[in-house]
Amino acid sequence: MDFFNVVDIDAAIHFFKQYNVRKAAIFGSYARGDDHLNSDIDMIITFTEKYDLLDIIGLKQDLESVFKRPVDLLTYESLRDDSFAANILAEAKLVYEKN
C-alpha cells in the first residue's frame, strides 16, 4: 500500500511544523511496500530545536490520531553506528523536510 494514499499527509505536516521537526522519514513495512492492514508506521525524525521526551510523546500521539494506527518514532540522534541503524537509513523514505 502506498503510504501517501493511507495517511492525511497535510495533517501530518501540520504536526511536523508544530513540533519543529526538521526531517521525517518512514522505514519498515511502509517504506518497503509490504505493509498490511494492521501494520504500524515506523518513522525516524530530527528536530530543528532542542526537544525532550514530552515532545516525542506528543508528536507520536498526534500522528497516531492522524494515521489511525500505531506509530513508532525514532530520532536520527538516537541511532548508533551499527547494522540496525544502517538498515533503517538504507530503506528510509523522506516524507517531510523543512525548507
Regions found by a protein language model. Give the residues of each.
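Catalytic core of pol beta-like nucleotidyltransferases
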Residues: 1-23, 31-37, 48-99
